[in-house]
Curated annotation (Swiss-Prot):
Protein name: FMN-dependent NADH:quinone oxidoreductase
MF-aspect GO terms: electron transfer activity; FMN binding; oxidoreductase activity, acting on NAD(P)H as acceptor; oxidoreductase activity, acting on NAD(P)H, quinone or similar compound as acceptor
Gene designation per UniProt: azoR
Keywords: Flavoprotein, FMN, NAD, Oxidoreductase
Gene3D superfamilies linked: 3.40.50.360
Membership in a protein family: Belongs to the azoreductase type 1 family.
Reported function: Quinone reductase that provides resistance to thiol-specific stress caused by electrophilic quinones. Also exhibits azoreductase activity. Catalyzes the reductive cleavage of the azo bond in aromatic azo compounds to the corresponding amines.
Reactions catalysed: 2 a quinone + NADH + H(+) = 2 a 1,4-benzosemiquinone + NAD(+); N,N-dimethyl-1,4-phenylenediamine + anthranilate + 2 NAD(+) = 2-(4-dimethylaminophenyl)diazenylbenzoate + 2 NADH + 2 H(+)
Origin: domain of life: Bacteria
Length: 202
């Protein structure tokens, strides 16, 4: 079994999501001995932002690419193959301005490719990357899960569920720590709740 451990927070050792992903991976290895873990830090190894040039590199036949296009396409392909090879993916996804970090969005733009991880058919899109388990370590400075009005502001967990589902992944588990910027007591409570969830979700 292969597990891909992804962090995307820019806060380094101050990051709650990094703390949670580390705990999740440790628990997974304890309950699934022999799991091979590969680590990807998107804050350090950031995929290129999707652009016209980036898309052209992917779409141009390999034997017609420039040197720059060949390098760009190879980098994108490496991220995609790493994703496809994983049976389990643990993703650290803090909420930034109601959504996800740009580094994580760039990674998603690498792996969400028509004909590779999903396809369009006459009856609608079909995911091609199923049979994976994704565990999302969600951290939030505020609280956004306690009412419909607050949940409407969530373009973090909801987006991840949507895009992963579009690629055929419906086994998405969320470990959430929210309100972590609302004082030391609230932060401690949020982390304790998340730790308890890890024990039941892994």
């Amino acid at each position: 079994m292969k597990l891909l451990h992804i962090d995307s927070s820019v806060l380094a050792e101050h990051s709650v999501s990094r703390q949670l992903t580390a705990r999740i991976v440790t628990e997974w290895q304890a309950t699934h001995p022999g799991t091979a873990v590969e680590y990807l830090d998107l804050a350090q190894d950031t995929p290129a932002t999707l652009s016209g040039a980036e898309l052209a590199a992917r779409m141009t036949p390999a034997d017609s690419r420039s040197a720059e296009q060949t390098a760009a396409a190879a980098r994108t392909e490496a991220f995609l193959q790493q994703f496809l090879a994983a049976n389990v993916i643990v993703v650290g996804a803090p909420m930034y301005n109601f959504s996800i970090p740009s580094q994580l969005k760039n990674w998603i733009d690498c792996i969400a490719q028509a004909g590779r991880t999903f396809k369009y058919t006459e009856t609608g899109p079909v995911g091609l990357a199923g049979n994976k388990t994704v565990i999302v370590a969600s951290s939030r400075g505020g609280v956004y899960s306690t009412s419909e009005a607050l949940r409407a502001l969530d373009h973090q967990e909801s987006y991840l569920r949507t895009v992963l589902g579009f690629m055929g992944i419906d086994n998405v588990r969320i470990v959430r720590a929210e309100g972590v910027n609302q004082g030391a007591d609230r932060r401690s409570q949020a982390l304790a709740a998340a730790e308890a969830d890890i024990a039941t979700l892994v």
